Amino acid sequence: MLPVQTSNLAAAFTDAVRALAPADATLPAVTFERPKVAAHGDLACNVAMQVARALKSNPRELAQRIVDAVQADTRAQGLVQAMEIAGPGFINLRLTPAAKADVLRAVLAEGDHYGARERGVHGQVLVEFVSANPTGPLHVGHGRQAALGDALANLLSWQGWHVHREFYYNDAGVQIQTLALSVQARARGLKPGDASWPEAAYNGDYIADIAADFLAGKTVSASDGEPVTASGNVEDIDSIRKFAVTYLRNEQDIDLQAFGVKFDRYYLESSLYSDGRVEAAVQSLVGKGKTYESEGALWLRTTDDGDDKDRVMKKSDGTYTYFVPDVAYHTTKWERGFTKVINVQGSDHHGTIARVRAGLQGLDMGIPQGYPDYVLHKMVTVMKNGEEVKISKRAGSYVTVRDLIEWSNGGDETIRGCLDTGVADWPQHFTRGRDAVRFFLLSRKADTEFVFDVDLALKQNDENPVYYVQYAHARICSIFESWGGADWEARLAELAGADLSAVTGPEASAQAQALGRRLAEFPDMLSGAAAELAPHAVAFYLRDLAGDFHAFYNADRVLVDDEAVKRARLALLAATRQVLRNGLAVIGVSAPRRM
């Protein structure tokens, strides 16, 4: 339903229940859902069963009293055609044709804004995602973070938040020194397996590429930094470090550009040390009595905030453990005015959540408990040519985001090849691959493991979920082109005043009714997905919507001789096309007119 329809109907039900309950009773929020069986109606409500025990009433008898009250409520009149009590106390509702028609008219009138809320109604939110170490290319796990984080940011923006996207670079510590030593070894002509190869060095072929460019004295730059020119001196470890980090940041920028992800800020971990924020956070915790010394180390009393044991902050060698700069970093988020923060990370970060939150509580800055929120995702396995693509950290072999985009794009064109030949609009050459990777990585809940099947991503049939959804959009465009010619979009305004009874009234087919119901669910689906931090729900919805469209297409011919019926069905398709476009926009996938 439209938000105003939902709120009016929910208010009518809430007041009906409130009138039957004791004044001090705590009542659940009234919600509506789609009945499992379409023949049961358009909406179902289980509030009678939820409150029956508290009201000491029989659920079915209570449901009848609620129905009687709602039927007399002016807010429900014009919305509800009939209500029926089913099973142990479900209330099934059938909406009026006028209410259904109002949904279609709203979609056509609001266009690209259907389902969106006014910007700023919720304030600011910072979404941190990807945040890869600049020690290697973006791998498939980072790709899942990019898909989740960017779709979540879009989703929150649609729900009225001012969204800030941030990438946190871990450009300090042992890993960066290991990167520099790895490149230095390659520059000296060493390779993995040699006796003098550094212990724990990075073994990937990309290290050799960095070393070659360093020796050649090349210049590289990241999107937010100054250019860095290699000295070519293999003994200059500082020059190697700066060049290698910037080289890899540039490579990551290229991958993110291919993936269609833009960040508002790149925050460097190293700046937390140079600005004194890490030391300031530690000293504040010490001063507030939140720490103690034991075995030569400084410990944080994280058990005070629910952790299973206290954690080391500063090791006996004087270095900080990895969660300490994270605490300092999150103080900057709070101080910058982001009272809501969401971190999208791999499930291997689960152990840091309690530590970071405990550190923030210990600082006594007014930060609420449970800050920040986390969306954790599980690993991705890649299948290609019917076999699992083997990865090995030790050997330096893994599947990158770039690999997935290129493989899923089809053909032999590569991103590096486009860059080397100066193709200006190169990201557009990889739209198909980008769309497939984004959609696939959102086609499962974040907390479930996922198998990315490259062969499936290349299929052009209904087995491929992104093709299935995009083809629904393209098929609708084809119908409109048959109706209105090349300039059919300019004629869509003609449908605004169409009589919609052929798709909303009693004569409408079951498939038309089902499609209309699905379109009505879009605003509430977005709201629920945002509240649950669950962008996968949008991908799920789009597959269901495409299925409803294809069922309608197979059941009802659109371009019929009866002008009124034709215009009604075209209006339904125009609304369907619009919602497909809007949903795909939320998850960062294109809506092609032809396929």
UniProtKB/Swiss-Prot annotation:
Protein name: Arginine--tRNA ligase
Residues annotated as transmembrane: none
GO molecular function, one term: arginine-tRNA ligase activity
Organism of origin: Cupriavidus necator (strain ATCC 17699 / DSM 428 / KCTC 22496 / NCIMB 10442 / H16 / Stanier 337)
Catalytic activity, as annotated: tRNA(Arg) + L-arginine + ATP = L-arginyl-tRNA(Arg) + AMP + diphosphate
Coiled coil: none
InterPro entries for the chain: aa-tRNA-synth_I_CS, Arg-tRNA-ligase, Arg-tRNA-synth_N, Arg-tRNA-synth_N_sf, ArgRS_core, DALR_anticod-bd, Rossmann-like_a/b/a_fold, tRNAsynth_Ia_anticodon-bd
One Pfam family recorded for the sequence: tRNA-synt_1d
Motif range ('HIGH' region): 132-142
Enzyme class: ligase
